[in-house]
Structures are given as structure tokens and as C-alpha cells.
Amino acid sequence: LGDVYKRQPVHGDNYLYIYCLWVAGSFKGKGYAKSLIEYCINDAKEKGKSGVCILSSKKKKPFLADKKFLLKYGFKVVDTVKNEYELLALSFNGEKPYFSESVKEMRIIGQELTIYYGLQCPYIPNCIEQVQEYCTKNSIPLNLIAVDTLEKAKNLPCIFNNWAVFYHREYETNHLLNETFLKKKFQL
């Protein structure tokens, strides 16, 4: 897998990991997602990869790939976490990727608002800034953890799509936060 894969709590021999497959709503129905996934599959085959994998969920969730769309291209569920999040893979040789064992609990030790983040998504720096400002202004304890090494990525306590939020030890969401979402979701 490429460098993006190295920042995921996923193991797979020679797999290409799709971090994000998203098309803005205004472009829906124009075939862009189809073109992107077909290009990715062909690129992986040309590069001799074992397959392609991506994070999804049983029910559609924000910031995660649409499972129904991927199933149309032959992707299959190869691993699950908490009977909710799924690793989908399109294997070219029968080998299957899997989540790191550390992902299975989806819990941390700390009680404070804790965010694990990577910087592959262009929206993340702005979200971090908004969360820091809001928490500082309202005296809310905040723990920000940059996932900036291979070791941190492979030992994450949760599924990860470059943003993972915990509160009172529990995994809450991969939804990017801003002031409005903080107030609504956590009553902070």
C-alpha cells in the first residue's frame, strides 16, 4: 500500500488503500465516482497490487464510502468493528486485508474530548482550529493527537479516516467537528 495506507490501522499485503472516495453533491449522477473507482482498480492492477481496500459502514455514514456503490464493483466485507464499521476489499489474488487488533475496542483511557487526526484531508486544519478556539473559550479539556508516524497509525484505538473523536472514553464519531457540531453532539 501507498503512504496513505501506512497511516491507517489496516494491514494488507500489497493492497492499495482508498482514503477518500467522495464527489460533491452538485456533481452527483455525472459518473465521476464511477470513473474514480474504475481508475483506481485499473491502476492497482497495472501496479501489480493484491487488491484495493476502503473503510465503510453497514449503514451510510458521513465521510465514509458508500458500501452499496462499492459492492457493485465486486468489493466484499473482509473485516468489521463493533458490528458497524467495515473494511471492504476487492482482492485480485484471494488475500484479504484486516484491521489492527487495537481497533476492536473503540475506547481510550481519557475522559476528555480527544481527537486523533491526520492531515490528508484539506478540511482538517480548519476543524482543529475551530475546536481549539471553542474548547479554550469554554474551558473544555481537549486532547489533540496527530497521527504522524507509522507506529501511531498501526496502534490507533479505533477505525480511522483521518479524524476520530472520543468523549468520556468512548468513540463517538469520525465526523469533522466545528462549534455547531460540538454543541449539538456533546452539549458542550
Language-model regions, residue ranges each:
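Short, small-residue-biased leader/transition segments that mark boundaries at the very start
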Residues: 2-5
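Non-catalytic, surface beta->alpha helical segment in thiol-disulfide oxidoreductase systems
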Residues: 168-188
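Conserved GNAT acetyl-CoA-binding A-motif
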Residues: 44-61
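Local sequence-structure signature of Cys/Sec-based thiol-disulfide redox active-site neighborhoods
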Residues: 103-137
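Conserved catalytic-core motifs of GNAT/GCN5-like acyltransferases
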Residues: 55-56, 71-88, 172-175
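Conserved acetyl-CoA binding element of GNAT-fold acetyltransferases
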Residues: 7-25
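Conserved acetyl-CoA-binding loop-helix of GNAT-fold acetyltransferases
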Residues: 23, 29-45
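C-terminal "cap" of GNAT-fold acetyltransferases
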Residues: 82-104
